From Swiss-Prot:
PANTHER family: SOLUTE CARRIER FAMILY 35. One of its GO terms (biological process) is transmembrane transport. The chain crosses the membrane at residues 117-137, 183-203, 211-231, 234-254, 264-284, 302-322, 354-374. Keywords: Membrane, Sugar transport, Transmembrane, Transmembrane helix, Transport. Belongs to the TPT transporter family. SLC35D subfamily. This is Putative UDP-sugar transporter DDB_G0278631. It is a multi-pass membrane protein. GO terms for cellular component: Golgi apparatus; membrane. It comes from Dictyostelium discoideum. May be nvolved in the import of UDP-sugars. Pfam families: TPT. The lineage of its organism: Eukaryota, Amoebozoa, Evosea, Eumycetozoa, Dictyostelia. It is found in: Membrane.
Amino acid sequence: MKLKPNDIYIPLNSIQFKIHHNDINIKYDTEEDNNNNNNNNNNNRYIDDNEKMKISEDESIFKSINNDNKNQQNDNIINSFNRGSNSFLFNIINFYKSPRFLSGGAVLLYVMTTYDFSASNFLLFNQMVVTIVILHILKHFNILKINTNFEKETIKKLMPLSFCYIINVLLGLDSLKQLNIPMYSALKRLVAVVILVMEYFILKKVSPPKIIASVVVMVIGAVVAGITDLSFNSLGYSLVLLSCIFQASYLIYVKKVASNMSTYDMLYYNSVLSLPITIFLMIVNQEIEYFQTFEHLYDSSFQAYFILSIFLGFFLNFCIFFCTSVNSPLTTSVTGQVKNIASTIIGAMVFNDIIIHPINILGLIINIIGSIWYSFLKLTSK
């Protein structure tokens, strides 16, 4: 290639293109400069990449910390829930495993035995108050018709009912603390005998011979089982027998006044008239002060069972009043013993507070046969 006077030629290995020496404004890059620029760019990219990686790592760490915090918070919430639910489920399992579940007033007795809560009158007082409040609410919304006007004749008629109810409940709870479940169930079937006698003298009612025979079979079974009970407890037997008398009186009174009063009226009056008795017993036993200083007062499980026992008390009383009004005191008594058949069998097999004896088992079987026979006779007579 021929060079002109004003041209400068630089070898291609040191320059990328040809320029005119007067064109000073033209920027050119040598291979060295390009290498430097490339190195700088690479360095810049490396720095940018490092910064991005660092930022990305920081963000990841920050997100990880946040996630860890959130996970820890969630774990704390879940663990707290699990601890609470497991505690409640554990109590539920223990409750259903408890022999007291198999008897009447299970929740009430569970509260008293598991938490060593001895203020039974205070608990019954709350049951009465809740019953009154519920009935007033139902009346206010015209769901039920309840006569809340007290008259002297009504008070005189129902006062024995309320007295027998309170005494029966208290004696039943105390006797359950002294006896095992099969023996308690067997002896409570003697209520049917007391009712047969009271129906004859008070209601002027004579039961058919087969009904009487089935009741006699139940009594024989109870006596046989009681004689061979190696864990004999004289106090427990005395309390449960007294409880039978007051329970029979209570059911007889319900039937006697049922013709002139609805089930809801009887339930309302019984609750109101029971209040003075329970208040008096609470004051005498200093149960209000006891409740205020009770060690499990703020235990959520105790609170749940306490409230549950109150509302179940209302439901149980309504069922007893209704069944007795529609049927008879004897039927209510025997029907209430049907679940005691399962109580007797399961209690004898599962729980270790029973001393097994062959004759004792025979007595329980005879007792159960009498209960089934009575139920069959009542069903076929309808």
